[in-house]
Amino acid sequence: MQDDIPIPRYTLLDGATATNLFSAGMRPDECPEEWMLSHPDQVIALGRAYLEAGSRILYAPTFSANAAQLARFGLADAVAPINRELVGLARQAADGRALIAGDLSPTGLSLEPAGEDSFDELCRIYADQAAALDEAGVDLFVIETMLSVPEARAAVLACRKYKKPVWVTMALNEEGMLLSGGQPLACLVTLERLGVDAFGFNCGAGPEEMVTALRTISPYASVPLIAKPGFPAGAPALDVFADEARRLLDAGAGIIGGCCGATPEHIGAAHNMLTRYVPQPMAPLTSAQENDIWLTNEMALFALDEDRIDFTEPIACGYDMTDDFLAAERDSVDVMLVSIETPDDALDFAGDARFAVVPGCFYSDDPEALSRALFLY
């Protein structure tokens, strides 16, 4: 299916997979993929229950079916067959009445320089799973429970080569920030520019934090917004869940579902609410906001007047660029102008980029070096 899948203004997703399968006998310490493939009837029955409750998009149970997660159970080389078979179970459940989303999630890797894993390795892991999901025939990709912008970027880059929609949902903490500490609005702007087709939140904190985050980002969003709240303290009563779903719609979400703790009954309650829902007007951007140039890193968002951008003098890349970054901040310039002459320059900049407070702008006469810098940053 192509990337122009028609999505209704209000679309209902499914609810939790793992917590419902725990109730069906799956243990938290065993490989979920092996358990599901040895209990296909349980997986199909759960999917069909969501379908009957009103879900129009079912997530294939491929959440942790990437090489890094499967390696814990000696299955790193089985990414393709495991994803293919799990998508097949979702297809049986949907019976042609719902779209199937290929589900990608965090790998558990720790990226350089704080960790030992490279961004290239992260991209390879997601590329392998995305290829398997595409071959299995998913209708769209959902990259969910993302903890940080870099990992979300890697997954988006892996999925984007296929002509299918790519959705991303981030996990929030109790302060309404990304679990990495990043700002939801900065994340939205970054991923929109990467070409995602929908953006939002799942898991992490509960619906209250999602309502706040949605109200913050909805005036700026040019893609549909997703809300799939989890309930770590226990699933609420059905009427409470339906009311929370309504509040998420009022805050700007158009695609809703449930995460940890949400059952088919909860999705049914949200479906009943949707049949009576009256859309609320959203606050527009001011004309000044519409004309701004928006720049982001994971922690901050910068709005610049395109006629008044103050650049630094060209900054050459090197092993330690922190003094240059501090000087740009001290001089109160708007943007650092960074010279990228070789692919190694791109590596040098990426290695220190976490220390940069001022936005960066690359210039280069070498297309390969510039492409590498954009890829890493």
Where in the sequence are the language-model features?
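Domain-level signal for soluble alpha/beta catalytic cores
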Residues: 1-377
